[in-house]
Amino acid sequence: MARVEIRDYQGDFKDVAEFFHRVWIGEYGGKTWFPIPNPAFMRWRVGPESGGFNPVAYRSGELVGSVFSFPHSLRIGDTVFPVSISTGFTVDDAHRGVALQLVQRFREEIEERGIAFGIGLVFDDPTTPSYRFWTKYAQTFPKNFRIVFKSGFWAKFLEPHALARAGIKAWERIANRTLGPLLRFTPHKYDPHVRPYRAGDLDRCTQMLKTSTAGFDWAMAWQPEQLSAQLRNPAYETLVFERDGQVQGMVNYHSLPMQGRELVQAAMIDLWADEGLGFAERVRLLSHLCTHLAERGVHAVVAPRSAMMPAGAFVANLFMPAPQGFFIGVFSTSRSVALSPPKTWDLTII
């Protein structure tokens, strides 16, 4: 049998996207919602310019396993730690033995890079390979990896007809068929105070993010140049709420095709920050975003149910807790400290 080779990925991510699609459709298709990676987005998110570390496994020249990551800073309490956000852990069903090799290579690399924690998302569905692998790994190697907390997503249905076909659970399909006009409703349409982000907004957006997350137990720590790279990247879009010449709110998101029983076009809200906005203005900013996306053929909007996202504004715009949740798992290194589940948090997770 040919030997498995673990090496750093070098490529344009097109083969990786095809690999993900083949494996994930086979494992999860029609069973649970999952994102479909875009090669251009992956090149930006985990490519060499991001500082990403991407070990992949090959057997006889065939891609059979992968894990990708990108560096960031995470404030936990009063201390800022270097962390690695991991994503795309995928192993071909016929070569599951490479999973532990990939994990070990990832752990060795983050240790060598001086990373305090590796952080990743795990599906909460007990029937999925993701859940089974990571819960077993945590039980077997408790000093290496642990599940720290559970959360989920907000979801807004903009095109119920598409979601009635694509829904995983019968109740999802029935709800979209029978309650479609209600589910797509937003209390407002476009708001004159909302406009696209401009480069001159960077300092204000950086300050709003810092202020908005200052009281969180866990929060991503953004440097201006890092935030600028995301806000100006063509894979993302950002809207700001400006009043009396001052930016008082921002929402940043990216397109995220999601696979259920069928493929739907979704948008993931990554960042929300505001300073000086009341409940009504937050509702209007989110309504504006939903209107903007609906007119561009987006079927659904999702966002992590984190402290960053204003729950009241989401409820007012008829977002609902999505049926599928997730766990946040953490890899430990020699620089790690003891962690307690955060009551309030903000993480980039996809």
Task: State where each predicted segment sits.
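Conserved acetyl-CoA-binding loop-helix of GNAT-fold acetyltransferases
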Residues: 86, 95-110, 120, 278-291
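Active-site/acyl-donor-binding loops of N-acyltransferases
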Residues: 118-183, 237, 243, 249-350
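Long, hydrophobic/aromatic-enriched structural stretches that serve as scaffold segments
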Residues: 65-101
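Short amphipathic alpha-helix that is part of the acyltransferase structural core
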Residues: 1-58, 63, 84-85, 177-222, ...
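Extended intrinsically disordered, low-complexity coil regions enriched in Ser, Thr, Gly, Ala
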Residues: 17, 21, 25-35, 77-85, ...
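Conserved beta-strand in the GNAT
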Residues: 54-56, 62-72, 85, 246-257
